[in-house]
């Protein structure tokens, strides 16, 4: 739930599978990164999960980074796809900075001028399941980039074992318990956010995503979901 779009578990699972299947159809390799850039939304979260289900590695990029830094992160990650929203797409286009040759998919709506398809049009047909990829504890789960305040942002690779450990801690903390919602008010490129998000999803919880932090809205959501 991001305030504009709400999905049940069944709906989310079907969409994640369709996105993952299309990533595989377009050649996503085991452990290969999938770059994601944009405001935190339900669809952003779906792409993040689909990259992992497809056997790849999610690479959420910092929205506050400069175009030059973003281009460097995309190249460093080794991604073949960039999932992006219109706000960030316009910023990058206006900057004139050359970007790596990635397949662009729009998270929020199609961009015919750039030839970038809309996520829900691009993904595989309903009912198409991704091929199961055998992964181990040391295989990459996601790449988190440093802030870059002292230079080019550095990629920090988290293994699947590391995230599994966080999921186990989340279970002990009650994340995913019946009737409990997790309110996430920080961006999904933040490791703090992701640690709580993946644990919530691992145990069938409800994740409530804030596109941008707003104190009054946060209090309203906290009252609504407590």
Features from the language model and the residues they span:
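Conserved AMP-binding A3 loop
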Residues: 6-10, 141-165
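Conserved structural elements of the adenylate-forming
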Residues: 13-18, 137, 156-177, 185, ...
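Conserved adenylate-forming
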Residues: 67-68, 75, 95-114, 202-206, ...
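Conserved AMP-binding/adenylation subdomain of ANL enzymes
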Residues: 164-181, 189-226
């Amino acid at each position: 739930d991001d305030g504009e779009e709400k999905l049940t578990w069944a709906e989310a699972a079907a969409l994640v599978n369709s996105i993952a299947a299309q990533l595989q159809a377009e050649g996503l390799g085991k452990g290969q990164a999938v770059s994601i850039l944009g405001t935190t939304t339900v669809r952003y979260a779906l792409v993040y999960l689909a990259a992992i289900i497809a056997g790849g590695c999610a690479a959420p990029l910092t929205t506050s980074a400069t175009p030059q830094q973003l281009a460097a992160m995309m190249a460093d990650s080794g991604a073949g796809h960039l999932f992006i929203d219109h706000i960030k797409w316009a910023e990058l286009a206006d900057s004139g900075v050359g970007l790596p040759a990635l397949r662009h998919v729009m998270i929020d709506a199609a961009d015919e001028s750039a030839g970038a398809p809309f996520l829900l049009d691009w993904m595989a047909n309903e009912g198409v399941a991704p091929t199961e990829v055998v992964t181990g504890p040391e295989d990459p789960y996601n790449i988190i980039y440093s802030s870059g305040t002292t230079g080019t942002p550095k990629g920090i690779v988290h293994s699947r074992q590391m995230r599994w450990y966080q999921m186990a801690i989340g279970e002990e903390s009650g994340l995913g318990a019946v009737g409990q919602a997790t309110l996430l008010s920080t961006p999904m490129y933040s490791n703090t956010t992701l640690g709580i998000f993946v644990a919530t999803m691992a145990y069938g919880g409800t994740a409530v995503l804030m596109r941008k932090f707003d104190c009054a809205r946060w209090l309203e959501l906290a009252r609504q979901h407590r």
